[in-house]
């Protein structure tokens, strides 16, 4: 909701409070139902558009230079287009009725958060491990990770789960929340368009942001752009996580020591912060399509990664999310109260 949606007598602070209500509803919806299988999701629409555009670009752009140019257009066309369409949808719904606008805004914001999905994915694999069905655990894990899982041991499966939930805690939970909050304070924009634009950037990175062919050139802009726009929310999330973990000095010491070894400027920080807070070590040797790939070791190996450790990581993400949401709500309430 933006100033364009302002009804007579409404102030900017009141609009911010209304958007905060939508954010609270969205958080509850994600907690309650997550992303049900079979329901159309905005990321699916983004993925379809990105896939079609990428195939066309790869077909007609044959030189590295032309592919890089096409990649820039693909990246920012998708990001700005997603934000623009989201703005129009929210505007149209608000024009129909303010209640419709709030409802659609809440649903759209809920679709940007993946906290429930991450927890369900992790617990799905952990349930197979608990039932002592290693083959089932491997097959379920394969649905969520890119590495080869057919020969993984239980400790390796646990490490893969932890790395997945801690890496995706930023781009799937904290960064969308960050941009939703930022959007609330930008005139005319609003929470949904900015959060959706971020999801578009994240989806682009996951689909084309690879160093291997045929994506090395066409995906270069998407990968770099996602790195840049995730940098600030990642560091803020690490800061707040270090505080709620009760080990701020340990988390920052190990992040400064280890995080920069990772090729990604953000996932290394995210994974390392959790590893430091939990007293475990992530990284090591993985196989992708039969090819060995070694990732830097992050954190100190003080204890093994177990299902209990993974649950602690999921709870840290939830508490971090609730901390940001709570601070935003307190700010909105105090600002509205003090302005009267």
Which residues does each predicted region cover?
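Short hydrophobic targeting helices and cationic amphipathic motifs
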Residues: 5-6, 13
């Amino acid at each position: 909701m933006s100033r364009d949606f302002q009804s007579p007598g409404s102030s900017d602070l009141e609009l911010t409070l209304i958007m905060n209500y939508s954010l609270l509803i969205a958080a509850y919806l994600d907690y309650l139902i997550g992303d049900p299988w079979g329901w159309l999701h905005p990321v699916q629409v983004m993925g379809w558009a990105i896939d079609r555009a990428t195939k066309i670009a790869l077909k007609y752009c044959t030189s590295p230079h032309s592919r890089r140019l096409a990649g820039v257009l693909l990246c920012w066309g998708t990001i700005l287009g997603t934000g623009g369409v989201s703005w129009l949808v929210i505007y149209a719904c608000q024009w129909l009725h303010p209640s419709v606008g709030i409802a659609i805004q809440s649903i759209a914001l809920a679709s940007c958060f993946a906290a429930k999905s991450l927890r369900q994915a992790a617990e799905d694999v952990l349930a197979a491990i608990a039932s002592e069905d290693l083959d089932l655990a491997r097959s379920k894990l394969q649905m969520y990770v890119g590495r080869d899982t057919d020969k993984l041991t239980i400790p390796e499966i646990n490490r893969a789960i932890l790395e997945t939930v801690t890496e995706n805690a930023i781009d799937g939970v904290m960064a969308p929340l960050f941009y939703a909050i930022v959007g609330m304070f930008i005139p005319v924009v609003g929470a949904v368009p900015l959060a959706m634009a971020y999801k578009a950037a994240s989806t682009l990175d996951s689909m084309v942001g690879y160093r291997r062919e045929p994506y090395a050139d066409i995906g270069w802009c998407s990968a770099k752009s996602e790195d840049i726009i995730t940098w600030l929310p990642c560091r803020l999330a690490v800061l707040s996580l270090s505080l709620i973990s009760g080990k701020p000095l340990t988390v920052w010491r190990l992040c400064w020591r280890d995080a920069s070894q990772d090729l990604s400027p953000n996932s290394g920080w995210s994974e390392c912060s959790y590893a430091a807070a939990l007293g475990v070590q992530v990284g090591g040797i993985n196989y992708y399509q039969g090819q060995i790939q070694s990732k830097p070791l992050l954190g100190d190996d003080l204890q093994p990664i177990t299902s209990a450790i993974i649950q602690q990581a999921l709870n840290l993400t939830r508490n971090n999310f609730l901390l940001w949401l709570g601070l935003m709500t307190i700010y909105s309430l105090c600002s509205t109260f003090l302005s009267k």
